[in-house]
């Protein structure tokens, strides 16, 4: 800073251009602000015309309430808005826009024309501005009820900003993504998009479930809904509904993730963490889940005014929101069974609370879920495999038992015993399915074993292929988790306590969450303003670096109010135990053993994926088999 320069007020033009740097980054930023204004005006149809990716032209026309001629100049002024009057309004704001600076910022870096007409006006009025001329010119115009905003030559007066724009296709892709997000947020509004004269999107109003499903399919692709779980739950003033993709429908990029808070699309670290936790055990490494979720909460407990573009929000009780999201998604994914995945065309697994305590998860959400499952086992159907002829087959009846809380060692021993060779076991004959397809379990009955690796089974839909090691590994893993939940986390005292240097804020956090650390098997003591002593760590993690583990947990607690680091480490150990305890490749199984494994899969959470996220089974329908052999052509 030049010591001789004096402090001066910035010109309105320069001030708006500085503000535009925060609000207007690219054409997609402009379309977001214009569409939000249209939605706030009560529009039921919005038409968008774009040329050259939005750099040459952006035109948005709506059938909303319109703007009166007296208010038109104010619409282009900074900090002028019709949406809030005082701080109380700001704290409970439900409109998408409220700051009153978007149009002023846009008009400072582009040529803007705003035309509008209210329902009780005899004619429309138009106002024009350019970046170099901030004085608006108002004149009569012809226009139906509603508003049109035309933005031409974006960044024409700021060449440096224009240089940072990408290729036309890239800019249009960003712009189209904004429209898709808003179209998902508002099913009651029709959206039509044209680019260089070509229709790209034409989405009509959606007022029923079928219409909403069509819109989601149009935006996310038909494959998403076919591989998605509908979800809806409301508890303690929080409501979550929408669709979550099955783990098998994951993506290499996080490009099919839509989360809305009170109708506003947001990208929030707390939400991302909760979703990542829920999918932790079922996603292959490096893959990303898919979801379209709508979260509704009292607007007074969420702050939407924490980011210039309003992409981020802050919850008053982030811990409660995190646990609610994680618990709901975790239960939904855990409730998926093979018969759900075979449902067509859409898997249905709507989560509803079963009582006043339903859906409540504490700091150890996953372990609380396991405890709930232990306390209230659900009855399961019994399947009886009919013989294939007198003396030619076998009678096999399987009644699934509730998963009981047994010590980890006993759980492994029981499974080793279960899969020990049966005395005098013979391969036997495959079971013939009953005519009419009645009483056939979802994964059917085993036919044979291939190379000691895969189980071939027949169900009502056709052929089922099962990776027996991966499937058994998941069953073992889930049972070990339940056993661990019942036993709890025992602590291992350290012979020599370890000293950990932390910030004062981290030390305060450790004291505040003392009970959380105790439940995790830690014993911490504060020795000074910025020093902690680690006196005990979880017994299962005695080989881990205690200092690093505690530091990571503290970082999570300060960021999210909860931590899954310990559970992740423990799950990794249990996964290793399950892998070593599972049946190996080239192990020959008798048909009763194969069928026993299939029945266990049907009654085990997340049995569709192994511990590493790979699929454990796949279905080949008769149509798929016919295509292989060109039948019917």
UniProtKB/Swiss-Prot annotation:
Physiological role: This protein is involved in the repair of mismatches in DNA. It is required for dam-dependent methyl-directed DNA mismatch repair. May act as a 'molecular matchmaker', a protein that promotes the formation of a stable complex between two or more DNA-binding proteins in an ATP-dependent manner without itself being part of a final effector complex.
This protein's UniProt keywords: DNA damage, DNA repair
CDD domains the UniProt entry points to: HATPase_MutL-MLH-PMS-like, MutL_Trans_MutL
GO cellular component: mismatch repair complex
Organism: Pseudomonas fluorescens (strain SBW25)
Family: Belongs to the DNA mismatch repair MutL/HexB family.
GO molecular function terms listed in the Swiss-Prot or TrEMBL record: ATP binding; ATP hydrolysis activity; ATP-dependent DNA damage sensor activity; mismatched DNA binding
NCBIfam families: mutl, PRK00095.1-2
Name of this protein: DNA mismatch repair protein MutL
One GO term (biological process): mismatch repair
Domain of life of the organism encoding this protein: Bacteria
UniProt KW Iron keyword: no
Transport keyword on record: no
């Amino acid at each position: 800073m030049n010591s001789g320069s004096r402090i001066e007020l910035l010109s309105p033009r320069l001030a708006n251009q500085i503000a535009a740097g925060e609000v207007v980054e690219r054409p997609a930023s402009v379309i977001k602000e214009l569409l939000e204004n249209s939605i706030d005006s009560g529009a039921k149809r919005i038409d968008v015309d774009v040329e050259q990716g939005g750099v040459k032209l952006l035109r948005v026309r709506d059938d909303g309430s319109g703007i009166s001629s007296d208010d038109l100049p104010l619409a282009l002024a900074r900090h002028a808005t019709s949406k809030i009057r005082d701080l109380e309004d700001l704290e409970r704001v439900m409109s998408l826009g409220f700051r009153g600076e978007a149009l002023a910022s846009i008009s400072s870096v582009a040529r803007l024309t705003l035309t509008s007409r209210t329902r009780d006006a005899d004619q429309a009025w138009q106002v024009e501005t350019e970046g170099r001329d901030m004085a608006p010119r108002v004149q009569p115009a012809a226009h139906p009820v509603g508003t049109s905003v035309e933005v031409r030559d974006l960044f024409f007066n700021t060449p440096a900003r224009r240089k940072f724009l990408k290729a036309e296709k890239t800019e249009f892709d960003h712009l189209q993504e904004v429209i898709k997000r808003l179209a998902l947020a508002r099913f009651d509004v029709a959206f039509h998009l044209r680019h260089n004269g070509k229709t790209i999107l034409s989405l009509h109003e959606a007022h029923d479930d079928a219409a909403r499903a069509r819109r989601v399919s149009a935006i996310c692709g038909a494959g998403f809904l076919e591989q998605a779980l509908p979800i809806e739950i409301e508890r303690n003033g929080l409501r979550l509904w929408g669709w979550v993709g099955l783990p098998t429908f994951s993506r290499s990029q996080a490009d099919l993730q839509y989360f809305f808070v009170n109708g506003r699309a947001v990208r929030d670290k707390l939400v991302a963490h909760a979703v990542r936790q829920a999918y932790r055990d079922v996603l292959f490494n490096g893959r990303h889940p898919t979801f379209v979720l709508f979260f509704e909460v009292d607007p007074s407990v969420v702050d939407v005014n924490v980011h210039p573009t309003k992409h981020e929000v802050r919850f008053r009780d982030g811990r409660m929101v995190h646990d609610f999201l994680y618990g709901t998604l975790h239960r939904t994914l855990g409730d998926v069974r093979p018969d759900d995945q075979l449902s067509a065309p859409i898997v249905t697994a709507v989560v509803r609370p079963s009582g006043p305590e339903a859906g409540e998860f504490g700091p150890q959400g996953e372990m609380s879920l396991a405890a709930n499952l232990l306390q209230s086992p659900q009855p399961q159907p019994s399947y009886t495999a009919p013989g294939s002829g007198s003396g030619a087959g076998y009678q096999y009846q399987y009644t699934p038992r509730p998963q009981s809380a047994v010590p980890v060692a006993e759980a492994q021993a029981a499974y080793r015993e279960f899969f020990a060779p049966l005395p005098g076991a013979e391969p036997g004959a495959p079971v013939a399915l009953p005519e009419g397809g009645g009483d056939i379990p979802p994964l059917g009955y085993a036919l044979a074993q291939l190379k000691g690796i895969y189980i071939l089974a027949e169900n009502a839909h056709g052929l089922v292929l099962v990776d027996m090691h991966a499937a058994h590994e998941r069953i073992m893993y889930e049972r070990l988790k339940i056993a661990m939940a019942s036993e709890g986390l025992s602590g291992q005292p350290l012979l020599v306590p370890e000293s950990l240097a932390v910030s004062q804020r981290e030390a305060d956090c450790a004291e505040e969450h003392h009970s959380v650390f105790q439940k995790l098997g830690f014993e911490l003591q504060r020795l000074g303003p910025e020093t902690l002593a680690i006196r005990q760590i979880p017994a299962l993690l005695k080989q881990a670096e205690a200092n690093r583990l505690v530091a990571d947990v503290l970082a999570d607690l300060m960021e999210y109010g909860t931590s899954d680091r310990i559970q992740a480490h423990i799950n990794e150990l249990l996964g290793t135990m399950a892998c070593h305890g599972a049946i190996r490749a080239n192990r020959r199984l008798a048909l009763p053993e194969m069928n026993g494994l299939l029945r266990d899969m049907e009654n085990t959470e997340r049995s569709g994926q192994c511990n590493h996220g790979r699929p454990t089974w796949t279905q080949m329908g008769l149509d798929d088999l016919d295509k292989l052999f060109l039948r019917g052509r």
